[in-house]
Regions:
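Conserved catalytic submotifs in the C-terminal HATPase_c
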Residues: 85-86, 110-120
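Short beta-strand/loop element within the Bergerat-fold HATPase_c
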Residues: 147-159
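Acidic ATP/Mg2+-coordinating residue in the GHKL
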Residues: 167
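Short conserved segment of the HATPase_c
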Residues: 172-184
């Protein structure tokens, strides 16, 4: 018990330290641009607009980090309201991946979608599942750039439904696979840094899946195939 508490305390201290650093960095940049705008009232309009655009981007980045922190806090405290219902997985998966189709086509990705014709129902929260799939697809787009292939596969067995999100990008070395879902895992190339750059992305994804009574798994062979699999309970109708 004391050992687990000590590990949790160390993890929390590390998370607070990293969040403080991640907040300080964009805020310092924002303050720098504001100073420049303040000290140079005669600045050209196009240069002023460029700087204001950067201020906006950094402000959104900071806001995203704060949202991540509070989302994770809610999930881990059990305060997140998450009504569970039957989800038509075919529809949810199809709508989510198709929303990325233009981006993927523009970046030259080959997209593989395998969704069966027969209805497959899972038990979960549609909003949470939507966020999980968005997170994983965004992750694959960012880190699968090398292989230029991305796929979504929906499948089932007698008791569960499975969604595989895969890519052929740089992947994750075996020594890091067990750690990528940890809070604030800060390996330079870790995929846990993809979500708003906060180091909380895959942790939030995992907590959302677990809050729906499911599980998430990862297997990866760098530059060949990386697969995140979301498993939820199957609903028989």
């Amino acid at each position: 018990m004391s050992s687990n508490y000590a590990k949790m305390e160390i993890s929390m201290k590390k998370m607070v330290s990293n969040i403080s650093h991640d907040l300080k960095t964009p805020l310092t940049v924002v303050l720098g641009y504001i100073e420049m705008l303040h000290l140079d009232p005669a600045m050209q309009a196009d240069e002023r607009e460029r700087m204001l655009g950067k201020v906006y981007v950094k402000t959104q980045e900071t806001l995203g980090l704060i949202h991540d922190f509070f989302d994770l806090a809610k999930l881990e405290s059990g305060d997140q309201d998450m009504p569970m219902t039957r989800i038509l997985m075919n529809e949810r998966c199809g709508k989510t991946i198709l929303a990325y189709y233009d981006i993927l086509a523009e970046q030259g990705y080959l997209v593989h979608i395998e969704i069966p014709d027969q209805p497959i129902y899972g038990f979960g929260n549609d909003e949470a599942l939507h966020r999980v799939l968005n997170n994983l697809i965004s992750n694959s787009i960012q880190y699968g750039n090398h292989g230029k292939q991305l796929g979504l596969t929906l499948r089932e067995d007698e008791s569960s439904v499975y969604v595989d999100i895969w890519d052929r990008g740089k992947g994750i070395d075996a020594m890091h696979i067990d750690h990528v879902f940890e809070r604030m895992y800060t390996l330079e190339d870790s995929r846990n840094k993809f979500y708003q750059g906060s180091g909380l992305g895959l942790t939030i994804t995992k907590r959302l899946v677990e809050s729906m009574g499911g599980s998430i798994h990862l297997r990866s062979k760098p530059y060949e195939l990386t697969v995140f699999t979301v498993q939820l309970k199957k609903v028989h109708y």
